[in-house]
Every structure is written in structure tokens, then in C-alpha cells.
From Swiss-Prot:
The lineage of its organism: Bacteria, Bacillati, Bacillota, Bacilli, Lactobacillales. It comes from Lactobacillus johnsonii (strain CNCM I-12250 / La1 / NCC 533). Mn(2+) 1 binds at H9, D13, D75. PANTHER family: BNIP - RELATED, MANGANESE-DEPENDENT INORGANIC PYROPHOSPHATASE-RELATED. Its main location: cytoplasm. Keywords: Cytoplasm, Hydrolase, Manganese, Metal-binding. This is Probable manganese-dependent inorganic pyrophosphatase. Its EC number is 3.6.1.1.
Length: 311
């Protein structure tokens, strides 16, 4: 059987990397020849989780077709979020928890998606269905992914399935998920030593919304006022990125993981800003607005933006 690469989206988070690792282990147990890789360097939170459970970060690839003919995707399906030459390889498997958009294939494939808080929750279910024992380290990295995506089960994306998976995986991994989870999340909130250009690209995704190219980035912090001291520099970096990459709108969501509130910074045309204000029923003031309780890009940001841009 020919080798396949497994990877998550660009600017990978803990779910993108952790689920790729877990899926590769599962598929290899089932007879496939796979390798988990990444479409970018691991962030500080992910590095903390990898180190905790004894993993080295997957190698980073820029293209896939120079290595393999087929790939498996986790935690994404939209082509603009995937490897740059996704159109040159065959996608044989997808495991995801996001909307399906601009995705089509020439051949049938395995596609597993569910509206849960994290792709690793689906992966946990797949291990159980296949009756494959989950090793301690794999359980730990899957647990880390769910904690990351659900903000320690506080995100509105959290489901009973996520909660059940966390309890089960924490037991296998041998950790107190609340204590470990808070340490892991805090490890990802150190922004002092990073440039604005790096921060707006660490956890960012592009979306095609009715012909508009919309970029949504998110950073997690424990001190929101301190982060907002860099507002002008953030806006400058966002504006430069928009001009360089052709974004019609760039939104940066700065989320306080301790109280689950966010502040949004927005750059773009007057038309796109008007659509943003319509989406959130909120008025921008000097390119900034408070978004209380908004922590999930997938559930609380992309759907209202989609509706506003398609209206």
C-alpha cells in the first residue's frame, strides 16, 4: 500500500497536529502506511502538549505531491486552508468538525464529520468503534486537542460527546484534565516575545464568503488590556497583510481565556466593515469592538459573517 500523508490546516493548532498524530497511529494499526505531518510550525500551546506526552513535532511540509499521490485531511476541508498543491493529490479520507465548503473530489472517499467541539472527539469515537486500544501518549495529545478547541469545555461548541471524551482520555493519559488543561492553555498565551506579524498569523484561517476573501485570526490571552496596548501595531500588520494577500476583510479576535470574553479588531473596506457590524449587531469604534462571550471562530464568528456577506 502506497504511503499517504495526514495533516491538518495551515497555521496548525493543537487539534490539527494532535489529531493528525492520533489518526496516523490508528490508520497504521488498520493496515495503512501513513505519516502525520504539519502545514506549519507548532505554536507554544501545542509544543507544551507535545512535550508533556513525549512527542516531537511532526515535520512541516510545503507541498505534498512531490512525496505522495494521496493524502488524508483532519480538522479542515476547505482547499484554501490546506496544502498549497491539494489539487494535485487524491484525498482519500477526511475527518473534520467544520462546515463543508468548496470541497469536491473526482473519486469516492471516506468522509467523517460531526458538529462536535473538536476533531479529536471524533477520533476518540473511531478508536472505540474499531476497538483499537488508545496508548497513553496518544490519549494525552487527543485530550490536549479537545481542551484547546473547547477552551477547557467552556466554549459554546462543547458537546456531551466532548465531555465524555475528555473524561475517558484523561483517565488513560493519567492526568487531572482541569489542572493540566489550564497549564496548557496558559502556555499558549505568552504574546510578549512575538511580533504583531507573527501573532496575526499564528491561528488564522481564510474564508471565501460570497466572493469576498475574509481572514479571521485569533489569539488567546490572560490579560486583554495588555494585548490591546498593541492595537495600532496589530491594525498596521493586518492592513499590510490584507494588501499583500488580497483580503477584503481581516478580523483579529483577541480572547481572554479566563473570562471567555473577546475584543475584535477589524480592517477592510467600508462595505466589509458594515457587513461585520451587521453580523454582530455591534458598532466598530476606531476599528475595535467588544464581543462578550464570543470565543469560537467556528460557531460564533464564521456563521454570522457568512450570513452577513451573503445577504
Amino acid at each position: 500500500m502506497a504511503k499517504e500523508l495526514i495533516f491538518g490546516h495551515q497555521n496548525p493548532d493543537t487539534d490539527a497536529i494532535g489529531t493528525a498524530i492520533a489518526y496516523s497511529y490508528l490508520q497504521n494499526k488498520l493496515g495503512y502506511d501513513t505519516e502525520a505531518v504539519a502545514l506549519g510550525e507548532a505554536n507554544d500551546e501545542t509544543k507544551y502538549a507535545l512535550n508533556k506526552f513525549g512527542f516531537t513535532a511532526p515535520r512541516v511540509i510545503k507541498t505534498a505531491s512531490n512525496e505522495v499521490d494521496a493524502v488524508m485531511l483532519v480538522d479542515h476541508n476547505e482547499p484554501q486552508q490546506s496544502v498549497s498543491d491539494i489539487d494535485k493529490v487524491k484525498v482519500t479520507h477526511v475527518v473534520d468538525h467544520h462546515r463543508i465548503m468548496n470541497f469536491n473530489t473526482a473519486d469516492p472517499l471516506y468522509y467523517r464529520a460531526a458538529p462536535v467541539g473538536c476533531t479529536s472527539t471524533i477520533m476518540w469515537q473511531m478508536y472505540n468503534e474499531k476497538e483499537i486500544e488508545i496508548p497513553q501518549d496518544i490519549a494525552g495529545i487527543m485530550l490536549s486537542a479537545i481542551i484547546s478547541d473547547t477552551l477547557l469545555l467552556k466554549s459554546p461548541t462543547t458537546t456531551d460527546q466532548d465531555k465524555e471524551a475528555v473524561v475517558s482520555l484523561a483517565n488513560i493519559a493519567g492526568v487531572d484534565y482541569k489542572e493540566y488543561g489550564l497549564k496548557m492553555l496558559k502556555a499558549g498565551t505568552n504574546i510578549a516575545d512575538k511580533s504583531e506579524e507573527d501573532l496575526i498569523d499564528l491561528d488564522a484561517k481564510s474564508f471565501e464568503l460570497n466572493g469576498s476573501n475574509v481572514r479571521v485570526a485569533q489569539i488567546n490571552v490572560v490579560d486583554l488590556p495588555e494585548a490591546l496596548e498593541r492595537k495600532d501595531a496589530f491594525l498596521k500588520a493586518m492592513d499590510e497583510a490584507s494588501k499583500r494577500e488580497g483580503y477584503d476583510m481581516f478580523m483579529l479576535l483577541i480572547t481572554n481565556i479566563l473570562d471567555s470574553d473577546s475584543e475584535a479588531l477589524v480592517v477592510g473596506s467600508d462595505e466589509s466593515k458594515a457587513k461585520f457590524e451587521k453580523a454582530f449587531n455591534a458598532k466598530l469604534s476606531d476599528s475595535e469592538v467588544k464581543l462578550p462571550g464570543v470565543v469560537s471562530r467556528k460557531k460564533q464568528v464564521v456563521p454570522p459573517l457568512t450570513n452577513a456577506f451573503e445577504a
